[in-house]
């Protein structure tokens, strides 16, 4: 297990929707930027269907709201390098895998990361967009012969038990998800405090439409 975020080197996060980056890697990105590491993020969709109130926030209006929220989240974490792929929210599984992978290959060639952060094959929450993006990343890294290590977001039992009620209330996970791993089996595990935790919370709060009142 790596003991420090600095062991990750330069980082490329590849996620499906705005707020995935904050929820699954906000602490890592903030700490890495504090340490002077290069961090870039790729987002597959604008999450235009990601609201509990689609009447108040129809997709054609929500697009710009989510874009603004994502910009604010990344700025809070100190990340200023971002690429948007522009796929339809909820439609990543319908994208030809080779097309999605080619877009990730472009990002890998551009940023030459030491580490790529993304979803595991189960998509962490089980969302089809997440699972599709995970496959694109795997195919892209293999196709580019990149030296980058790929790390998947995962969960451990104590975390799931501690926040079980919250996860249920907000329907965070599909049935049977996420996969559970022991901390000793993880590539890196950290518990954040201080300014790093503060910034992760603020980055999550930026996604106000997604979270609801």
Give residue ranges: language-model regions.
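Active-site rim/loop-helix segments in enzyme catalytic domains that contact anionic ligands
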Residues: 1-112, 139, 143
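Metal-dependent de-N-acetylase/amidase catalytic core
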Residues: 2-12, 90, 94-213
């Amino acid at each position: 297990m790596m003991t420090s975020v600095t062991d990750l080197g330069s980082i490329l996060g590849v996620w499906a929707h705005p707020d995935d980056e904050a929820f699954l890697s906000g602490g890592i990105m903030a700490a890495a930027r504090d340490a002077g590491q290069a961090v870039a993020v790729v987002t597959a969709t604008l999450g235009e269907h990601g609201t509990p109130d689609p009447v108040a926030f129809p997709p054609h209006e929500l697009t710009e709201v989510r874009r603004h929220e994502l910009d604010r989240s990344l700025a809070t974490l100190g990340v200023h390098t971002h690429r948007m792929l522009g796929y339809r929210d909820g439609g990543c599984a319908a994208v030809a895998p080779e097309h999605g992978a080619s877009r990730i290959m472009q990002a890998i060639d551009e940023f030459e990361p030491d580490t790529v952060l993304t979803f595991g094959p189960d998509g962490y929450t089980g969302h089809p967009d997440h699972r599709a993006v995970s496959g694109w990343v795997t195919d892209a890294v293999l196709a580019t012969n990149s030296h980058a290590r790929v790390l998947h977001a995962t969960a451990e039992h104590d975390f799931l038990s501690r926040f079980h009620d919250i996860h249920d209330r907000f329907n965070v996970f599909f049935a049977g998800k996420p996969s559970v791993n022991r901390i000793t089996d993880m590539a890196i595990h950290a518990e954040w405090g201080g300014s790093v935790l503060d910034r992760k919370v603020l980055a999550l709060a930026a996604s106000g439409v997604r979270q609801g009142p």
